[in-house]
Amino acid sequence: MPNTNITIHPRAIVHPNAKIGEGTSIGADAIVDEFVEIGDRCEIRARAIVTGHTKLGNDNQVGYGAIIGSEPQDTSYKGAVTFVEIGDRNIFREYATVNRGTKEGSVTKIGNDNLLFTGAHVAHNCKIGNRVILVNNVLLAGYVEVNDYAFMGGDSVVHQFTRIGSYAMVRGQTRLGMDVPPYCMAVDTNMVLGLNRLGLRRNGFSHERRRQILAAYDVIYRSGRNRSQALQFLESSAEFAENPDIQLFCNFIKASSRGICKLYERGASRIEEDRE
Protein backbone atom coordinates (compact mmCIF):
# COMPACT_ATOMS: atom_id res chain seq x y z
CA MET A 1 0.00 0.00 0.00
CA PRO A 2 2.44 2.72 -1.18
CA ASN A 3 -0.11 5.55 -1.28
CA THR A 4 0.01 8.04 1.58
CA ASN A 5 -3.41 9.66 1.22
CA ILE A 6 -5.30 6.57 2.39
CA THR A 7 -7.18 6.92 5.67
CA ILE A 8 -7.27 3.75 7.78
CA HIS A 9 -8.81 3.76 11.24
CA PRO A 10 -6.46 2.34 13.91
CA ARG A 11 -8.96 -0.42 14.68
CA ALA A 12 -9.32 -1.53 11.05
CA ILE A 13 -7.58 -4.73 9.94
CA VAL A 14 -6.04 -4.36 6.49
CA HIS A 15 -3.76 -7.06 5.11
CA PRO A 16 -0.42 -5.60 3.96
CA ASN A 17 -0.83 -7.21 0.53
CA ALA A 18 -4.24 -5.65 -0.11
CA LYS A 19 -4.22 -3.02 -2.85
CA ILE A 20 -5.88 0.21 -1.76
CA GLY A 21 -6.42 3.13 -4.15
CA GLU A 22 -5.76 6.80 -3.59
CA GLY A 23 -8.16 8.73 -1.42
CA THR A 24 -9.82 5.64 0.00
CA SER A 25 -10.92 5.53 3.65
CA ILE A 26 -11.39 2.45 5.82
CA GLY A 27 -13.43 2.73 9.01
CA ALA A 28 -13.20 1.29 12.49
CA ASP A 29 -13.26 -2.51 12.81
CA ALA A 30 -13.46 -2.96 9.04
CA ILE A 31 -11.56 -5.91 7.56
CA VAL A 32 -9.82 -5.92 4.17
CA ASP A 33 -8.21 -9.26 3.31
CA GLU A 34 -5.08 -10.21 1.39
CA PHE A 35 -6.30 -10.57 -2.20
CA VAL A 36 -8.61 -7.57 -2.22
CA GLU A 37 -8.17 -4.67 -4.65
CA ILE A 38 -9.97 -1.41 -3.87
CA GLY A 39 -9.92 1.49 -6.31
CA ASP A 40 -9.60 5.22 -5.73
CA ARG A 41 -11.84 7.32 -3.48
CA CYS A 42 -13.74 4.38 -2.02
CA GLU A 43 -15.25 4.42 1.45
CA ILE A 44 -15.22 1.21 3.48
CA ARG A 45 -17.33 2.05 6.50
CA ALA A 46 -17.06 0.72 10.05
CA ARG A 47 -17.36 -3.05 10.52
CA ALA A 48 -17.58 -3.73 6.79
CA ILE A 49 -15.69 -6.75 5.46
CA VAL A 50 -14.13 -7.05 2.00
CA THR A 51 -12.68 -10.52 1.55
CA GLY A 52 -11.72 -13.17 -0.99
CA HIS A 53 -10.46 -12.28 -4.45
CA THR A 54 -12.57 -9.14 -4.67
CA LYS A 55 -11.90 -6.17 -6.93
CA LEU A 56 -13.73 -2.87 -6.50
CA GLY A 57 -13.42 0.01 -8.94
CA ASN A 58 -13.45 3.68 -8.02
CA ASP A 59 -15.83 5.74 -5.87
CA ASN A 60 -17.61 2.82 -4.23
CA GLN A 61 -19.16 2.93 -0.77
CA VAL A 62 -19.36 -0.23 1.35
CA GLY A 63 -21.74 0.46 4.22
CA TYR A 64 -21.67 -0.40 7.89
CA GLY A 65 -21.49 -4.16 8.40
CA ALA A 66 -21.72 -5.00 4.69
CA ILE A 67 -19.80 -8.08 3.55
CA ILE A 68 -18.37 -8.27 0.03
CA GLY A 69 -16.62 -11.35 -1.37
CA SER A 70 -17.56 -14.01 1.18
CA GLU A 71 -17.81 -17.71 0.31
CA PRO A 72 -20.81 -18.84 -1.76
CA GLN A 73 -23.68 -20.40 0.13
CA ASP A 74 -23.48 -23.51 -2.00
CA THR A 75 -22.85 -27.03 -0.71
CA SER A 76 -20.83 -27.84 -3.85
CA TYR A 77 -18.24 -25.20 -2.99
CA LYS A 78 -14.97 -26.81 -1.90
CA GLY A 79 -12.67 -23.82 -1.57
CA ALA A 80 -12.03 -23.04 -5.24
CA VAL A 81 -10.47 -19.69 -6.10
CA THR A 82 -13.37 -17.56 -7.30
CA PHE A 83 -13.96 -13.85 -7.68
CA VAL A 84 -16.10 -10.78 -7.20
CA GLU A 85 -15.71 -7.92 -9.68
CA ILE A 86 -17.40 -4.59 -8.96
CA GLY A 87 -17.31 -1.48 -11.13
CA ASP A 88 -17.48 2.18 -10.15
CA ARG A 89 -19.79 4.39 -8.07
CA ASN A 90 -21.76 1.62 -6.39
CA ILE A 91 -23.34 1.96 -2.95
CA PHE A 92 -23.78 -1.06 -0.68
CA ARG A 93 -25.82 -0.04 2.34
CA GLU A 94 -25.81 -1.57 5.80
CA TYR A 95 -25.42 -5.36 5.94
CA ALA A 96 -25.69 -5.90 2.19
CA THR A 97 -23.90 -9.12 1.18
CA VAL A 98 -22.21 -10.21 -2.05
CA ASN A 99 -20.88 -13.78 -2.39
CA ARG A 100 -18.09 -14.81 -4.72
CA GLY A 101 -18.47 -17.47 -7.45
CA THR A 102 -18.73 -21.21 -6.87
CA LYS A 103 -16.80 -23.03 -9.60
CA GLU A 104 -13.07 -22.53 -10.07
CA GLY A 105 -12.35 -19.17 -11.68
CA SER A 106 -15.99 -18.07 -11.80
CA VAL A 107 -17.12 -14.55 -11.01
CA THR A 108 -19.92 -12.61 -9.38
CA LYS A 109 -20.14 -9.33 -11.34
CA ILE A 110 -21.65 -5.97 -10.47
CA GLY A 111 -21.40 -3.05 -12.90
CA ASN A 112 -21.54 0.69 -12.29
CA ASP A 113 -23.82 3.12 -10.45
CA ASN A 114 -25.86 0.51 -8.60
CA LEU A 115 -27.56 0.94 -5.24
CA LEU A 116 -28.10 -2.00 -2.90
CA PHE A 117 -30.22 -1.11 0.13
CA THR A 118 -29.90 -2.54 3.62
CA GLY A 119 -29.87 -6.34 3.75
CA ALA A 120 -29.84 -6.93 -0.01
CA HIS A 121 -28.17 -10.24 -0.90
CA VAL A 122 -26.34 -11.08 -4.14
CA ALA A 123 -25.48 -14.79 -4.29
CA HIS A 124 -22.69 -16.55 -6.15
CA ASN A 125 -22.23 -15.98 -9.87
CA CYS A 126 -24.91 -13.30 -10.15
CA LYS A 127 -24.52 -10.63 -12.79
CA ILE A 128 -25.87 -7.15 -12.12
CA GLY A 129 -25.66 -4.50 -14.82
CA ASN A 130 -25.60 -0.73 -14.43
CA ARG A 131 -27.92 1.64 -12.54
CA VAL A 132 -29.79 -1.19 -10.85
CA ILE A 133 -31.59 -0.62 -7.54
CA LEU A 134 -32.15 -3.45 -5.06
CA VAL A 135 -34.36 -2.25 -2.21
CA ASN A 136 -34.16 -3.59 1.35
CA ASN A 137 -33.87 -7.36 1.75
CA VAL A 138 -34.00 -8.26 -1.93
CA LEU A 139 -32.65 -11.82 -2.22
CA LEU A 140 -30.97 -13.00 -5.42
CA ALA A 141 -30.11 -16.70 -5.64
CA GLY A 142 -27.14 -18.02 -7.59
CA TYR A 143 -26.62 -17.13 -11.25
CA VAL A 144 -29.40 -14.54 -11.31
CA GLU A 145 -29.00 -11.75 -13.89
CA VAL A 146 -30.37 -8.27 -13.30
CA ASN A 147 -29.99 -6.04 -16.33
CA ASP A 148 -29.46 -2.28 -16.63
CA TYR A 149 -31.89 0.15 -14.99
CA ALA A 150 -33.96 -2.58 -13.33
CA PHE A 151 -35.64 -1.77 -10.01
CA MET A 152 -36.44 -4.45 -7.44
CA GLY A 153 -38.81 -3.68 -4.57
CA GLY A 154 -38.22 -4.68 -0.96
CA ASP A 155 -38.38 -8.33 0.11
CA SER A 156 -38.62 -9.59 -3.47
CA VAL A 157 -36.94 -12.96 -3.98
CA VAL A 158 -35.49 -14.50 -7.14
CA HIS A 159 -34.82 -18.19 -7.85
CA GLN A 160 -31.45 -19.24 -9.28
CA PHE A 161 -30.78 -18.70 -13.01
CA THR A 162 -33.69 -16.27 -13.35
CA ARG A 163 -33.20 -13.06 -15.35
CA ILE A 164 -34.61 -9.59 -14.83
CA GLY A 165 -34.73 -7.51 -18.01
CA SER A 166 -33.54 -3.95 -18.53
CA TYR A 167 -35.89 -1.23 -17.23
CA ALA A 168 -38.09 -3.83 -15.53
CA MET A 169 -39.64 -3.16 -12.13
CA VAL A 170 -40.30 -5.86 -9.56
CA ARG A 171 -42.86 -4.90 -6.93
CA GLY A 172 -42.11 -5.51 -3.28
CA GLN A 173 -42.54 -9.07 -1.98
CA THR A 174 -42.72 -10.51 -5.50
CA ARG A 175 -41.51 -14.09 -5.95
CA LEU A 176 -39.78 -14.94 -9.20
CA GLY A 177 -38.64 -18.18 -10.78
CA MET A 178 -39.36 -17.11 -14.37
CA ASP A 179 -37.75 -14.33 -16.40
CA VAL A 180 -39.13 -10.79 -16.32
CA PRO A 181 -38.97 -9.26 -19.83
CA PRO A 182 -37.49 -5.78 -20.30
CA TYR A 183 -39.75 -2.81 -19.51
CA CYS A 184 -42.30 -4.92 -17.60
CA MET A 185 -43.77 -4.70 -14.10
CA ALA A 186 -43.50 -7.99 -12.18
CA VAL A 187 -45.98 -8.75 -9.39
CA ASP A 188 -47.14 -11.60 -7.17
CA THR A 189 -45.55 -14.92 -8.23
CA ASN A 190 -44.13 -15.13 -11.76
CA MET A 191 -46.58 -12.62 -13.21
CA VAL A 192 -46.37 -9.30 -15.05
CA LEU A 193 -48.84 -6.46 -14.99
CA GLY A 194 -48.16 -3.97 -17.75
CA LEU A 195 -45.09 -1.84 -18.23
CA ASN A 196 -42.82 -0.04 -15.80
CA ARG A 197 -44.19 3.21 -17.23
CA LEU A 198 -42.82 5.43 -14.45
CA GLY A 199 -39.34 3.98 -14.85
CA LEU A 200 -39.49 4.42 -18.62
CA ARG A 201 -40.52 8.07 -18.29
CA ARG A 202 -37.83 8.76 -15.71
CA ASN A 203 -35.24 7.29 -18.04
CA GLY A 204 -36.22 9.53 -20.93
CA PHE A 205 -38.44 7.25 -23.02
CA SER A 206 -40.70 9.44 -25.13
CA HIS A 207 -44.45 8.87 -25.35
CA GLU A 208 -43.98 7.34 -28.81
CA ARG A 209 -41.30 4.91 -27.60
CA ARG A 210 -43.53 3.86 -24.71
CA ARG A 211 -46.48 3.43 -27.09
CA GLN A 212 -44.49 1.10 -29.34
CA ILE A 213 -43.19 -0.95 -26.40
CA LEU A 214 -46.75 -1.28 -25.08
CA ALA A 215 -47.91 -2.43 -28.51
CA ALA A 216 -45.21 -5.12 -28.53
CA TYR A 217 -46.17 -6.12 -24.98
CA ASP A 218 -49.76 -6.55 -26.17
CA VAL A 219 -48.61 -8.80 -29.01
CA ILE A 220 -46.79 -11.05 -26.54
CA TYR A 221 -49.37 -11.06 -23.79
CA ARG A 222 -52.78 -10.11 -25.21
CA SER A 223 -52.96 -11.07 -28.88
CA GLY A 224 -53.88 -14.72 -28.39
CA ARG A 225 -50.77 -15.85 -30.27
CA ASN A 226 -48.48 -18.41 -28.73
CA ARG A 227 -44.97 -17.25 -27.88
CA SER A 228 -43.27 -18.28 -31.12
CA GLN A 229 -46.08 -16.80 -33.24
CA ALA A 230 -45.93 -13.53 -31.32
CA LEU A 231 -42.16 -13.28 -31.72
CA GLN A 232 -42.39 -14.08 -35.43
CA PHE A 233 -44.99 -11.36 -35.86
CA LEU A 234 -42.88 -8.76 -34.04
CA GLU A 235 -39.73 -9.66 -35.97
CA SER A 236 -41.44 -9.58 -39.37
CA SER A 237 -43.65 -6.52 -38.88
CA ALA A 238 -42.48 -3.27 -40.47
CA GLU A 239 -43.63 -1.39 -37.38
CA PHE A 240 -41.46 -3.39 -34.98
CA ALA A 241 -38.65 -5.18 -36.81
CA GLU A 242 -36.14 -2.31 -36.91
CA ASN A 243 -37.01 -0.82 -33.53
CA PRO A 244 -34.07 -1.35 -31.10
CA ASP A 245 -36.39 -1.27 -28.08
CA ILE A 246 -38.46 -4.09 -29.56
CA GLN A 247 -35.35 -6.01 -30.62
CA LEU A 248 -34.14 -5.93 -27.00
CA PHE A 249 -37.56 -7.17 -25.87
CA CYS A 250 -37.68 -10.01 -28.40
CA ASN A 251 -34.08 -11.12 -27.96
CA PHE A 252 -34.53 -11.37 -24.21
CA ILE A 253 -37.63 -13.54 -24.59
CA LYS A 254 -35.97 -15.80 -27.18
CA ALA A 255 -33.00 -16.35 -24.86
CA SER A 256 -35.16 -17.42 -21.92
CA SER A 257 -34.53 -20.94 -20.66
CA ARG A 258 -36.90 -20.70 -17.69
CA GLY A 259 -39.78 -19.12 -19.59
CA ILE A 260 -41.14 -15.63 -19.05
CA CYS A 261 -43.63 -14.46 -16.46
CA LYS A 262 -47.31 -14.82 -17.28
CA LEU A 263 -49.94 -12.10 -17.48
CA TYR A 264 -51.53 -11.27 -14.13
CA GLU A 265 -55.20 -12.25 -14.09
CA ARG A 266 -57.25 -12.48 -10.89
CA GLY A 267 -60.81 -11.70 -11.97
CA ALA A 268 -62.54 -9.00 -9.94
CA SER A 269 -59.66 -8.76 -7.48
CA ARG A 270 -56.97 -8.13 -10.06
CA ILE A 271 -54.56 -5.27 -9.57
CA GLU A 272 -55.34 -2.37 -11.86
CA GLU A 273 -52.99 -2.07 -14.82
CA ASP A 274 -52.02 1.47 -15.80
CA ARG A 275 -51.59 1.58 -19.58
CA GLU A 276 -50.80 5.27 -19.99
Regions found by a protein language model. Give the residues of each.
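Terminal amphipathic alpha-helical/low-complexity segments used for targeting or macromolecular assembly
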Residues: M1-R11, P16-N17, E22-G23, D59, ...
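Structural signal for interior beta-strand "rungs" in well-ordered beta-sheet cores
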Residues: P2-V187, M191
